[in-house]
């Protein structure tokens, strides 16, 4: 039986599910950019790409060299094809306008070019997260200049989302709104090949991911929930749990998608004015779309992530996502 490449899968989606050709082309271009980023990441010190730039992004985070390189790769790969009206990146202050010399399309691309970049110098997994939205009609005319407002759509409006994870293998995990597929990069072929046909998250779990060093800063519902997890089979949950933490959302969520679990990045008392740490548009929305399509759930502790109306490109949010039972439990504690 012949192997199904990403290109073949997308063509079959166009035939069977009427996936627009422009969306198919967009996903293929993003995938090619991810292959280029994977190549740059794999070179490491040999390519002179390790270390920091000495600059900060709009989030106030020190930019790694590969943050900037990955951002440029995605911009240059996607700006010319005629399938996008604009782009937004975690690494840029403002929305990216498609240069006037190129045709414009009906979609918006939002991305975190290199999630978990603090892991680069220690050779731990990193990844690229992306989300695709339709551009509102008023911005498709030549009379209305594209601005931030075009991107401020709730996660329910995503038409596609995915991530590439650069680890022992490079994988692309994708949803077009009809389940979650996983593609592994065959470096000899140069193609992403379908290896995980229907990714599903078990409803219950015995694993969780959280940065325990921040415990003293958590709100009471999170402290209560984690204490119950740590109590194991002698506690109220009556089973033992394992904790995992890679310090890259893309790696922690990938583990949860492939074998179940709960990922938590709650708000804390160090910055009480901020509702959380992770970015709604670049991280929480695409990952929540994937998790829900895989049968899981995702909330900010109070409401469904995908229902949140964004107020800014770089809005932050608390995140609890993964197996349904555990997400429901910790969300319920926030409501008590």
Swiss-Prot record:
Give the record's cofactor note, including how many are bound.
Binds 2 magnesium ions per subunit.
Q: Which UniProt keywords apply?
A: Carbohydrate metabolism, Cytoplasm, Hydrolase, Magnesium, Metal-binding
Q: What EC number is given for this enzyme?
A: 3.1.3.11
- Where it mainly occurs, coarsely classed, is cytoplasm
Superkingdom of origin organism: Bacteria
Residues reported in the UniProt entry to bind Mg(2+) 2: 112, 115, 283
Under InterPro entries, the record lists:
FBPase_C_dom, FBPase_class-1, FBPase_N, FBPtase
Record GO terms (molecular function): fructose 1,6-bisphosphate 1-phosphatase activity; magnesium ion binding
Its pathway is: Carbohydrate biosynthesis; gluconeogenesis
HAMAP family (UniProt xref): FBPase_class1 (MF_01855)
Protein name, per record: Fructose-1,6-bisphosphatase class 1
Species name? Pseudomonas fluorescens (strain ATCC BAA-477 / NRRL B-23932 / Pf-5)
């Amino acid at each position: 039986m012949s192997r199904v490449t990403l290109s073949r899968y997308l063509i079959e989606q166009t035939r069977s599910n009427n996936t627009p050709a422009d969306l198919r082309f967009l996903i293929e271009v993003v995938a090619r950019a991810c292959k280029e980023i994977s190549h740059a990441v794999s070179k490491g010190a040999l390519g002179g790409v390790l270390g920091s730039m000495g600059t900060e992004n709009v989030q106030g985070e020190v930019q790694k060299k590969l943050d900037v390189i990955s951002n440029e790769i995605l911009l240059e790969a996607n700006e010319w094809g005629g399938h996008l009206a604009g782009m937004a990146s975690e690494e840029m202050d403002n929305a990216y306008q498609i240069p006037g010399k190129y045709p414009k399309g009906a979609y918006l691309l939002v991305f975190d070019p290199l999630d978990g970049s603090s892991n680069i110098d220690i050779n731990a997994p990193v990844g690229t997260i992306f989300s695709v939205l339709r551009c509102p009609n008023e911005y498709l005319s030549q009379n209305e200049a594209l601005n931030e407002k075009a991107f401020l759509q709730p996660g329910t409006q995503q038409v596609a989302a995915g991530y590439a994870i650069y680890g022992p293998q490079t994988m692309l995990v994708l949803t077009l709104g009809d389940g979650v597929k996983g593609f592994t990069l065959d470096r000899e072929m140069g193609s992403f090949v379908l290896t995980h046909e229907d990714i599903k998250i078990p409803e219950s779990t015995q694993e969780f991911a959280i940065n325990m060093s921040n415990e003293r800063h958590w709100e009471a519902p999170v402290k209560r929930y984690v204490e119950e997890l740590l109590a194991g089979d002698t506690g109220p949950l009556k089973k033992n749990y394992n904790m995992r933490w890679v310090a890259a959302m893309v790696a922690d969520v990938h583990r949860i998608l492939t074998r179940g679990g709960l990922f938590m990045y709650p708000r804390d008392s160090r910055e009480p004015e901020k509702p959380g740490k992770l970015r709604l548009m670049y991280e929480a929305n695409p990952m929540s779309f994937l998790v829900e399509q895989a049968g899981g759930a995702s909330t900010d502790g109070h409401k469904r992530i995908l229902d949140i109306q964004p107020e800014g490109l770089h809005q932050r949010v608390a995140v609890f996502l993964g197996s349904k039972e555990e997400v429901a439990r910790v969300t319920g504690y926030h409501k008590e």
